[in-house]
């Protein structure tokens, strides 16, 4: 095997390697490079290490968790000797100031400079000049650089029911990350929000497969079509966490799920499928286990279903430390070599090993040399990884052809990273969900004497949640773990500053005593909710407003003045006395611009249009149930998956009877639906167009979100009372009407047919169905209009 000695100065020479010739096809370039690679070089491509392994810790070891730049010795060790092919920026891995201008670091320019340092070293010093691929969690915008505008967390984006907003959010994220070189984005989360206790609920779009599918697919397209130059990809999107990650039996992160295969096929898989069908280049694996088999070691999940049934062709990556966890946590193998063999043979192409490049290299080579992993399987995985790198243009960066040039233009990175503020504001405005508005207390008069109070009134930390500047969020002294630099507070508007900008009469009361002492108050705006958290640190057996927040609301209610509660949270929470407040707004963790958006709604500049993408339980002790549940839960302490069937004698406690149902949200106007028209017949592999009229019967222009549901009166298997099959957003001026057309595929009616052991893909059963539009009330399944149709 030749030892290639090409250098950047020789880029135009005829003898340059075929894989560096941009005139060749990607397939030809991959073939040429793969043929030249040694086995250690190949297994190195299958490993992803934390960026901090490239920095020097005390005592000369590589692996500092501080905020230092990579150094030559550690880059040599990890990138050249261990031949690591991918680098991860973990939740706390923000770069220091790299400009020499005395800044506080963690800007777009700093991220680009860090990338240039690492990438140039890898390209110039590796035998075959193979660039590294850089991965980062960017779940609601480029969440690391402190100056970047952030979008609402995904559950808030779900409340917009706006695929355009999801696409724009992806495109703005891609613009920012691509400008800094970090072109592998670990988003979107396509898990379903079916258990409020789970600490990652806010990272999901919705509890419903159709809504999550539509938004996730749009987000993938936004991420991957920010085109630049000759390459088709903006950045690589990652559908995660395949599959069923959110379904743990106890609401804890990275835990066991018990999933009937029919439920997996008909309910859990569709949202992942939508992201894959939208073109997602990569898939990340569920960290938990399903039916006692770790997903990372499941050939059935990662090969039979993902590759065979779904036809996925891209890269499969494990989540953080999940391959070694097969040995250390799941105990299904005695050593790391065995863990690697199980994961790779199941279908994992790259391991997010993060800490131990040498351990990966040694154990992976042992697995191949012992025959536990075949050379063909290694080549298959590396071929996928190299294809991704070529598609992203990593082999055609300026620094590949001329070592004196940077890989990305760091001087342009800040502009790209800080763009998107107007788009984030629009998404926040669309997300806000009005849950209660007694006696039309809202909107408030623009000059009203508003008193703003509550622990989340002036907290960018609580407003943004996790994955914002740092893993556990923006710095706040009340938190204990893993937050950003206290100097790095993102620019934007809190609820307080947003209200004060809109109303010069507004005053801030820091605590209950000062709020009660504000005798001139005409209304109280109380901003409450959750503190920032991420992953398992957010798991909560009974999510609810804390006692001090509930006490504040109750004390203000005694004054007799209007109390408007603004909830800033990543999931529905038990409201306590807030449930009887004069008005309740759910603002989610609503972006850096959420304060302005809240003020726009409070004072009537914006008519709220958001609708719940997730059911809101009656109290914190209940998980809430799912809108499309079908049967009592078989899981003991989990009334989370299913509704109680009528008349089965188990009492009302397990019925779908939330405080606010899926799809609910009020407006400052009223809408009427009429003239519903549905095709009388539909092919099982076809689609149909639903038509109806929307009339704005109020005095304010507004946007109506209309979910379209289907009921199957009789069938061979138990089906939900209603299934969401489509939805639309329609803007209608006061007093006007619009005819609306909504198209849906018959495949949305699919179910896994057969007996208890059924496990195949969903099929559409012939028979009679009823299409339904619901009333916008707190009563579940209250039908407004309906029409029958037949599938044949």
Model regions and ranges:
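Short beta-strand elements
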Residues: 779-792
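Glycoside hydrolase catalytic-domain context in secreted enzymes
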Residues: 4-756, 761-779
């Amino acid at each position: 095997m030749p030892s290639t000695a090409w250098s950047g100065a020789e880029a135009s020479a005829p003898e340059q390697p075929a894989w560096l010739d941009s005139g060749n096809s990607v397939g030809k370039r991959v073939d040429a490079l793969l043929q030249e690679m040694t086995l250690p070089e190949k297994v190195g491509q299958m490993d992803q290490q934390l960026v901090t392994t490239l920095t020097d810790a005390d005592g000369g070891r590589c692996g500092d968790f501080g905020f230092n730049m990579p150094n030559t010795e550690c880059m040599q060790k990890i990138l050249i000797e261990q031949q690591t092919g991918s680098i991860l920026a973990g939740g706390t891995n923000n770069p220091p100031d790299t400009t020499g201008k005395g800044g506080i670091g963690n800007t777009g320019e700093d991220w680009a400079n860090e990338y240039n340092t690492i990438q140039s070293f890898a390209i110039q010093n590796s035998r075959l000049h193979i660039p590294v691929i850089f991965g980062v969690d960017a779940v609601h915008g480029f969440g690391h650089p402190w100056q970047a505008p952030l979008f609402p967390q995904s559950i808030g984006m779900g409340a917009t029911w706006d695929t355009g907003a999801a696409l724009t959010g992806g495109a703005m994220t891609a613009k920012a990350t691509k400008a800094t070189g970090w072109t592998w984005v670990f988003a979107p989360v396509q898990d379903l929000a079916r258990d409020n206790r789970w600490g990652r609920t806010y990272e999901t779009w919705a509890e419903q497969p159709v809504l999550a599918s539509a938004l996730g697919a749009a987000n993938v397209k936004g991420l991957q079509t920010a085109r630049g130059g000759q390459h088709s990809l903006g950045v690589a999107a990652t559908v995660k966490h395949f599959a069923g990650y959110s379904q743990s039996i106890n609401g804890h992160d990275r835990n066991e799920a018990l999933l009937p295969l029919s439920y997996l096929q008909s309910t859990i898989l569709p949202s992942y499928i939508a992201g894959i069908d939208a073109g997602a280049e990569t898939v990340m694996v569920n960290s938990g286990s399903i039916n006692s088999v770790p997903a990372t070691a499941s050939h059935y999940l990662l090969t039979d279903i993902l590759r065979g049934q779904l036809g996925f062709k891209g890269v499969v990556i494990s989540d953080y430390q999940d391959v070694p966890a097969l040995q250390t946590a799941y105990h299904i193998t005695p050593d790391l070599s065995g863990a690697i063999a199980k994961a790779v043979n199941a279908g994992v192409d790259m391991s997010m090993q993060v800490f131990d490049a040498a351990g990966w290299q040694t154990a992976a080579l042992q697995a191949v040399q012992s025959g536990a992993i075949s050379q063909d399987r290694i080549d298959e995985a590396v071929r996928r990884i190299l294809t991704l790198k070529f598609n992203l243009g990593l082999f055609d960066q300026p620094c590949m052809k001329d070592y004196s040039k940077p890989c990305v233009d760091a001087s342009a990175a800040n502009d790209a990273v800080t763009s998107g503020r107007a788009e984030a504001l629009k998404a926040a405005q669309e997300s806000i969900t009005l849950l209660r508005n007694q006696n039309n207390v809202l909107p408030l008069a623009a000059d009203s004497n508003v008193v703003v109070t509550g622990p989340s009134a002036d907290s960018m930390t609580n407003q943004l949640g996790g994955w914002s500047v740092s893993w556990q969020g923006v710095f706040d002294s009340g938190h204990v773990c893993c937050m950003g630099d206290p100097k790095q507070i993102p620019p934007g508007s809190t609820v307080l500053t947003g209200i004060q900008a809109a109303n010069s009469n507004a005053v801030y009361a820091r605590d209950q005593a000062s709020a009660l002492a504000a005798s001139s108050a005409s209304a109280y705006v109380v901003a409450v909710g959750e503190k920032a958290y991420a992953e398992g640190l957010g798991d909560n057996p009974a999510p609810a407003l804390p006692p001090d927040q509930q006490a504040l609301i109750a004390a203000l209610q005694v004054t007799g003045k209007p109390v408007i509660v603004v909830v800033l949270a990543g999931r529905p929470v038990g409201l306590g006395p807030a449930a009887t407040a004069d008005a309740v707004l759910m603002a989610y963790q609503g972006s850096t611009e959420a304060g302005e958006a809240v003020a726009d709604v409070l004072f009537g500049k914006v008519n709220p249009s958001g609708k719940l993408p997730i059911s809101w339980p009656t109290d914190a002790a209940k998980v809430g149930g799912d809108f499309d549940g079908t049967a009592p839960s078989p899981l003991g302490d989990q009334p989370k998956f299913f509704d109680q069937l009528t008349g089965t004698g188990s009492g009302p406690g397990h019925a779908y009877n939330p405080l606010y149902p899926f799809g609910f949200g009020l407006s400052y106007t009223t809408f009427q639906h009429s003239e519903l028209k549905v095709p009388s017949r539909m092919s099982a592999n076809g689609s149909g167009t639903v038509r109806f009229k929307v009339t704005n019967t109020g005095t304010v222009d507004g946007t109506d979100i209309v979910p379209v549901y289907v009921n199957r009166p009789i069938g061979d298997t138990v089906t939900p009372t209603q299934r969401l099959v489509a939805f639309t957003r329609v803007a209608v001026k006061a007093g006007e009407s619009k005819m609306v057309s909504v198209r849906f595929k018959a495949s949305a009616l699919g179910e896994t047919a057969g007996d208890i052991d059924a496990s195949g893909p969903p099929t559409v059963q012939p028979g009679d169905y009823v299409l339904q539009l619901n009333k916008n009330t707190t009563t579940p399944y209250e039908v407004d209009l309906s029409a029958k149709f037949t599938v044949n």
